């Protein structure tokens, strides 16, 4: 009973400290999301899960002295960097937006004091327009980034570069495929052509030979039938000539013409 009574205050103390720890974590996150000076604070989005504080400090300290660097862990994917001078923050936004930091291409913007989402968060609800909010692109008040003229120019340049890169890739792939086709045609051995020619020639010769043999046999039989018909018709013609009537006058064997004997007169 005494041991159980002693363990209860320890459990209560641990629960209290854990709740205080999580409360401070949430307070810190809320401070970084909502509090602080928005002119010196920079939002870094699209970070990887393994982003380190030292890498961010090296990348952003190039533009000026830093106050603090805070990286979100639950959920991960974004961070906040606070400068001492607002001009250094603007230079960092212009220089590091779209660069590769911690193994991923990050998005760097000036903090406006409104909550942002990472890749793992749900999109926040829209709030009404505030004239004190600043643009992420030019840093001026009165409009947002999607209405900024710089953002439209950058988007047009990106679309043009993408279209140029796509057209170049298509041209390169087409030229490469054509060169491959030429290589395959030139690299094809001549033996295959000779073999195909031989095969086609042999097939044509076989066909012509078979046709000539059949034709010769046909013509031979036809010529034989014609010769037989001619040989049979020739003796008939000779017989018809022999049977034709002889001339009326026939000479005697002595050569004198044969005359019919007149009847002798009886004295």
Curated annotation (Swiss-Prot):
The modification N6-acetyllysine is found at residue 53. Extensively phosphorylated on serine residues in the RS domain. It holds the Pfam family RRM_1. Residues 40-113 form the RRM domain. Residues 152-267 are annotated as: Disordered. The modification Phosphoserine is found at residues 61, 192, 194, 196, 210, 212, 221, 223, 225, 260, 262. The keyword Metal-binding applies. Required for pre-mRNA splicing. Represses the splicing of MAPT/Tau exon 10. May function as export adapter involved in mRNA nuclear export such as of histone H2A. Binds mRNA which is thought to be transferred to the NXF1-NXT1 heterodimer for export (TAP/NXF1 pathway); enhances NXF1-NXT1 RNA-binding activity. RNA-binding is semi-sequence specific. PANTHER family: RIBONUCLEOPROTEIN RB97D, SPLICING FACTOR, ARGININE_SERINE-RICH 1-RELATED. This is Serine/arginine-rich splicing factor 7. It comes from Mus musculus (Mouse).
């Amino acid at each position: 009973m005494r041991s159980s009574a002693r363990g209860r205050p320890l459990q209560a103390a641990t629960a209290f400290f854990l709740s205080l720890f999580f409360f401070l974590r949430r307070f810190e996150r809320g401070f970084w999301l909502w509090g602080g000076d928005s002119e010196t604070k920079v939002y870094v989005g699209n970070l990887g899960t393994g982003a380190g504080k030292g890498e961010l400090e090296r990348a952003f300290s190039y533009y000026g002295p830093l106050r603090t660097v805070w990286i979100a862990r639950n959920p991960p994917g974004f961070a906040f960097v606070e400068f001492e001078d607002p001009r250094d923050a603007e230079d960092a936004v212009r220089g590091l937006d779209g660069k590769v930091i911690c193994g991923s291409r990050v998005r760097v913007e000036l903090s406006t004091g409104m909550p942002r989402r990472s890749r793992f968060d749900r999109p926040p609800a829209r709030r009404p327009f505030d004239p004190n909010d600043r643009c992420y692109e030019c840093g001026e008040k009165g409009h947002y980034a999607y209405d900024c003229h710089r953002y439209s120019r950058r988007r047009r340049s990106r679309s043009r570069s993408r279209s140029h890169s796509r057209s170049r890739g298509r041209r390169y792939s087409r030229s490469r495929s054509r060169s491959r086709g030429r290589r395959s045609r030139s690299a094809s051995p001549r033996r295959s052509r000779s073999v195909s020619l031989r095969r086609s020639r042999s097939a044509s010769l076989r066909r012509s030979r078979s046709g000539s043999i059949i034709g010769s046999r046909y013509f031979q039989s036809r010529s034989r039938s014609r010769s037989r018909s001619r040989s049979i018709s020739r003796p008939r013609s000779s017989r018809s000539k022999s049977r034709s009537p002889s001339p009326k006058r026939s000479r005697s064997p002595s050569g004198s013409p044969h005359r019919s004997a007149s009847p002798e007169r009886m004295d």
